[in-house]
Amino acid sequence: MSQTEKIEEAVPSYLCEEPPEGTVKDHPQQQPGMISRVTGGIFSMTKGAVGATIGGVAWIGGKSYEVTKTAVTSVPSIGVGIVKGSVSAVTGSVAAVGSVVSSKVSGKKKDKSD
């Protein structure tokens, strides 16, 4: 026996074979760069990125995990999402979220002695 034959015998057949085409069933594959919606029965979260949600609209980026009623799938994606009332950008699992914050800053008052 050669060494390659020993290696082939050591690996179980179920690890070498491709999965059947019908294993995905009703779960469509999400394409990279797509924005994921949070709607009835679907919850999406992002691992390895920082972000925020305002008013129920969320962004995703980096590597996301989609949890449905029947399955959990890992979806690698690089994308830009939307946060209501502000701007967000996702680049390589690092996010920058900017929004308008209005605060009153009073100017320095001069004393009459100056």
UniProtKB/Swiss-Prot annotation:
Segments passing through the bilayer: 40-60, 78-98
GO cellular component: membrane
InterPro entries given in the database record: UPF0444 (IPR028153)
Cell compartment(s), UniProt: Membrane
Pfam families: UPF0444 (PF15475)
Keyword Transmembrane: yes
UniProt keyword list: Membrane, Transmembrane, Transmembrane helix
Topology in the lipid bilayer: Multi-pass membrane protein
General function of this protein: May play a role in bone development.
Family stated for the protein in its record: Belongs to the TMEM263 family.
Protein name: Transmembrane protein 263
